[in-house]
């Protein structure tokens, strides 16, 4: 049986980590560009937000519609919400989405994926390897 000392084991563990985990970068939540057009509220940079968060635009849309209790749809990279909502409220809901469905509850990093296991949604962290269940959006 091969014996390893602590330093050798630590070095082996660091070699197996993906590069993006080793670099220390700060996550900046995207700021929604919100405008009110008549009786609708439009998030103009919705496509960029979904790319930055690495989430399906449909999932983010479901979250906003459920939390705001409204109807809406995605149109050409914009999220159109029926009703007038203050930009601060939209920003707060996006922050809540990020905390619940993007950031790892264990290490706080945004390097996560939403994975469906059977009928349960799991937030899988690619940085620390943690798995945690998240609520299902209907």
Curated annotation (Swiss-Prot):
Gene Ontology molecular function, alphabetical: translation initiation factor activity
PANTHER family, sorted: EUKARYOTIC TRANSLATION INITIATION FACTOR, EUKARYOTIC TRANSLATION INITIATION FACTOR 2 SUBUNIT 2
Keywords recorded for this protein, A-Z: Initiation factor, Protein biosynthesis
Pfam families cross-referenced by the UniProt entry: eIF-5_eIF-2B
TM helices/strands, residue ranges: none
Protein's UniProt name: Translation initiation factor 2 subunit beta
Protein role: eIF-2 functions in the early steps of protein synthesis by forming a ternary complex with GTP and initiator tRNA.
Name of the coding gene: eif2b
InterPro entries registered for this protein in UniProt: IF2/IF5, TIF2_bsu_arc, Transl_init_fac_IF2/IF5_dom, Transl_init_fac_IF2/IF5_N, Transl_init_fac_IF2/IF5_Zn-bd
Cysteines paired by S-S bonds: none
Family listed: Belongs to the eIF-2-beta/eIF-5 family.
SUPFAM superfamilies the UniProt entry points to: Translation initiation factor 2 beta, aIF2beta, N-terminal domain, Zinc-binding domain of translation initiation factor 2 beta
NCBIfam families (alphabetical): aIF-2beta (TIGR00311), PRK03988.1 (NF003067)
Protein biosynthesis keyword on record: yes
Subunit structure: Heterotrimer composed of an alpha, a beta and a gamma chain.
